[in-house]
């Protein structure tokens, strides 16, 4: 027996909605300007097609093992291509997936959780790491159905709460919305002088961050899709396509609006804490140089945090590298849920 279609989309969304929805979007705007948001939208429409194909194939070539459905790219590559080539290609994909999903990608997500919790609540990184490992272990040992049940409970809650924050910020800044969308489209095609020189980089960054966020075509989504029990394979393909739209068009756009409406992405011309010096990309990462000369390497999530603070405080707001305000707490909690459920999906 398999999991339900709703559990499959919740599990898939758990994998798609992660640090890329906050840090990735912030980085895209930081490097490519507002126009990068448009190219993330374009990527979502193209990526939905990839998600449909890979998830449908996962359903077609899935296998029942020990009472549960198993499938994914390694399965449909081996059984779809057939012969020695299919076995070799499927094995290579499986090995690469184990390395990336088992070792590399969880490190990105857990590091984001640890950094945000340390910034907001001053919790030592090792305590966060141990907590994540313990909770994760308890859930994983329950099997795929337990993982799906947790994802079903957490994913809708975290996505809706995050989007509601964005909606609230839009409402209190409603007069800026028309100009904001105009800015996105104008800068997307290099029609604004400020962003004309980075037209190519804008597209590249928008596409990269869009794919990093929604994972369409990466081969990570079909595993959850294959575990679902549906009447027709294409139904699960359509459901997974919808999850790409939710990830990029809703959650990523929520982050983009939080940042763009408040204007905190353009720190070279924005309000700064006295003595604070914003820096662009350096060889050793993105950082903000504080008034005392220290450097904060927390990354571009700072712009999402500052976006919430400025939207709530209005004209009295000043960019604060120390992240004092509700923004740091909200983003830390959001990153915890986003990143933790992504690790769970892996």
What is each PLM-predicted segment?
Residues 1-22, 66, 230-231:
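Membrane-interface "cap" regions at the ends of multi-pass membrane proteins
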Residues 2-3, 33-41, 76-79, 83-92, ...:
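Membrane-interface alpha-helices at helix entry/exit sites of multi-pass transporters
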Residues 16, 25-32, 58-64, 210-233, ...:
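Helix-loop junctions at the membrane interface of multi-pass solute transporters
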Residues 30-68, 247-248, 252-254, 323:
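Extracellular loop-to-transmembrane helix junctions
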Residues 41, 89-96, 119-144, 161, ...:
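Transmembrane alpha-helical segments of multi-pass small-molecule transport proteins
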Residues 73, 113, 139-156, 176-181, ...:
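Hydrophobic, small-residue-rich membrane helices and short re-entrant helix-turn-helix hairpins
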Residues 93, 111-117, 124-172, 176-177, ...:
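Membrane-interface loop-to-helix entry segments
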Residues 265-326:
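Low-complexity, proline/glycine-enriched hydrophobic segments characteristic of transmembrane helices
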């Amino acid at each position: 027996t398999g999991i339900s279609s709703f559990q499959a989309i919740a599990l898939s969304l758990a994998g798609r909605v992660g640090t890329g929805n906050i840090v990735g979007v912030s980085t895209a705007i930081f490097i490519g300007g507002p126009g990068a948001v448009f190219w993330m939208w374009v990527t979502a429409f193209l990526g939905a097609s990839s998600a449909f194909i890979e998830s449908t194939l996962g359903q077609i070539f899935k296998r029942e093992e020990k009472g549960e459905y198993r499938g994914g790219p390694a399965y449909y590559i081996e059984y779809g291509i057939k012969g020695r080539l299919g076995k070799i290609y499927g094995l290579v994909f499986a090995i690469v997936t184990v390395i990336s999903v088992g070792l590399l990608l969880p490190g990105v997500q857990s590091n984001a959780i640890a950094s945000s919790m340390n910034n907001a609540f001053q919790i030592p990184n090792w305590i966060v790491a141990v907590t994540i490992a313990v909770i994760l272990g308890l859930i994983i040992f329950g099997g795929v159905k337990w993982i799906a049940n947790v994802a079903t409970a957490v994913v809708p809650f975290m996505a809706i709460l995050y989007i509601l924050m964005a909606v609230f910020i839009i409402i209190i800044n409603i007069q800026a919305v028309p100009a904001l969308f105009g800015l996105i489209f104008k800068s997307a095609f290099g029609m604004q002088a400020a962003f004309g020189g980075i037209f190519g980089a804008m597209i590249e960054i928008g596409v990269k961050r869009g794919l990093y966020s929604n994972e369409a075509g990466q081969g990570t989504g079909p595993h959850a899709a294959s575990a679902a029990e549906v009447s027709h394979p294409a139904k699960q393909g359509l459901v997974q396509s919808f999850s790409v739209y939710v990830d990029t068009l809703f959650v990523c756009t929520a982050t983009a609006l939080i940042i763009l409406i408040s204007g905190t992405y353009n720190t070279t011309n924005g309000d700064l804490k006295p003595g604070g010096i914003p820096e662009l990309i350096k060889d050793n990462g993105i950082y903000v140089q504080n008034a005392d000369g220290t450097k904060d390497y927390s990354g571009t999530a700072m712009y999402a945090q500052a976006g919430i603070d400025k939207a709530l405080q209005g004209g009295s707001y000043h960019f604060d590298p120390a992240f004092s305000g509700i923004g740091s707490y909200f983003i830390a909690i959001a990153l915890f849920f986003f990143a933790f459920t992504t690790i769970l999906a892996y």
